[in-house]
A protein has these predicted regions:
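Nucleotide-activated donor-binding/catalytic signature segment of Leloir-type glycosyltransferases, i.e.
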Residues: 240-264, 268-269
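Nucleotide-sugar-dependent
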Residues: 272-292, 296, 303-311
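Conserved acidic donor-binding segment of nucleotide-sugar-dependent glycosyltransferases
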Residues: 315-326, 333-340
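Membrane-proximal helix-turn-helix segments that form the acceptor-binding/catalytic region
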Residues: 102-105, 127-162
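Short N-terminal targeting/anchoring amphipathic segment
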Residues: 76-97, 109-114
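Short beta-strand->alpha-helix junction loop in the catalytic core
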Residues: 168-169, 178, 184-194, 240, ...
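Conserved donor-binding/catalytic core segment of Leloir-type glycosyltransferases
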Residues: 196-215, 221-224
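A charged, aromatic-enriched C-terminal amphipathic alpha-helix characteristic of glycosyltransferases
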Residues: 30, 323-325, 340-370
């Protein structure tokens, strides 16, 4: 149990309840890392805080689910002795443990969830590690059971308020879960080291993030060929060390701490040639944690105009282009060789760093939790 520490404002009325977080572990994927900064900003609003950290995508056994559920029930029981209880879940496509803990959560507590991959909460609810290790088994289970899975999600989330990290994501969630209250929030821009101005960095672009399907790494050869030879390409992120070598591309693998600072200072822009559409399962609408990471380092972003990137481009710091590698390469070269354009985007990013700080982004969640706790107390 972490002790709440007020690190945001000097004085504020706290919400009279315990907050319990259910999320994947730190370093198990982007959602677990996101939860660490997010919950640190939320803790000071509560007098008591507990957390249950689970295995990440593909790293949860069936027995783990029973253990986590028993742990959550025990934490809720202890917290209820001290007053109201709010349980917040971080849900994503392949993080099955938080979903199954939510499905078994007591209806007598207030539940909320950040849904990272709208329009569904968990796309593959049976993807425990034994299933994740066998692609044929994964699809053999989930494809035939899509309709049942959809109904299971609607039942599990029926008493839960859902948050999406974009407006387009919130609209899609409302269509999928018409019985749920859905609220729109934003992905925060974390605080990172100040780097040199973008135009003073090497003439290079970066691809960053977990090397998962749909994240653009499969377009690396095509992208390298489309960019002028004087533009270097640098790739970093968990799992990228397993990518096949490509001439003219530096592949770094995972970078943490000072290594991450060095990576971002070695590129003038981050590219997001994302395509999160599956012909079998449909289109995902995640907010880009990689874009927020790039903004933290004052780095412009260019990507395909798909999913949530078109909406994000309206806020600045990001340019969305048609879903063409050739078009992305042309626009990227124009931007990274134009000092005035880079300075304009840097200025926009500076505003985003202030407007989408974690302290501000957490406020819609805090407002809902306060309202829900007050309503429960009033109805007693």
């Amino acid at each position: 149990m972490r002790e709440p520490k007020d690190t945001i404002d000097a004085v504020r009325p706290q919400i009279p309840a315990s907050l319990i977080l259910v999320a994947p572990r730190v370093n198990s994927g982007g959602v677990g890392d996101y939860a660490e900064d997010f919950i640190a900003a939320a803790i000071p609003y509560f007098p008591r805080f507990r957390e249950i950290r689970t295995g990440g995508p593909g790293d949860v056994r069936l027995l783990d689910l029973f253990r986590y559920r028993a742990q959550l029930a025990a934490e809720i029981e202890k917290a209820a002795l001290e007053g109201g209880v709010v349980v917040h879940f971080e849900l994503s496509a392949a993080s099955v443990a938080p979903f199954w803990l939510l499905a078994g959560c007591s209806p007598h507590v207030i539940t909320s969830a950040t849904v990272h991959d709208p329009p569904r909460a968990v796309w593959w609810p049976f993807r425990v590690n034994a299933v994740a290790m066998r692609k044929w088994l994964h699809h053999g289970i989930h494809l035939p059971l899509r309709l049942m899975s959809n109904g299971l999600e609607q039942w599990a989330l029926r008493n839960t308020t859902l948050f999406a990290l974009s407006n387009v994501g919130a609209r899609s969630l409302q269509d999928t879960f018409p019985g749920c209250r859905v609220l729109s929030a934003r992905h925060f821009v974390p605080t990172k080291a100040a780097l040199k101005p973008v135009f003073d960095r090497p003439l290079a672009i970066g691809l960053y993030g977990h090397a998962a399907k749909g994240k653009g790494f499969e377009r690396l050869v095509e992208l390298r060929a489309a960019l002028p030879a004087d533009v270097h390409v640098v790739v970093a992120g968990r799992g990228t060390e397993r990518l096949p070598p490509v001439p003219g591309v530096s592949i770094l693998g995972a970078v943490e701490g000072p290594e991450e600072d060095v990576f971002f200072e070695s590129v003038r822009a981050i590219l997001l040639p994302y395509d999160k559409t599956s012909r079998f399962y449909g289109k995902m609408l995640p907010a880009s944690g990689v874009a927020s990471r790039a903004f933290a380092y004052g780095t412009p972003v260019l990507g395909f105009d798909s999913g949530t990137l078109g909406e994000a481009a309206k806020a600045g710091g990001l340019i969305a282009v048609p879903n063409s590698v050739q078009e992305l390469a042309r626009e990227t070269y124009r931007v990274i060789t134009d000092q005035a354009e880079l300075e304009r985007m840097e200025s926009e990013i500076g505003e985003l760093q202030k407007e989408q700080s974690v302290r501000k982004v957490v406020m819609p969640f805090v407002s809902f939790w306060r309202e829900a706790v007050d309503e429960r107390q009033h109805n007693k």
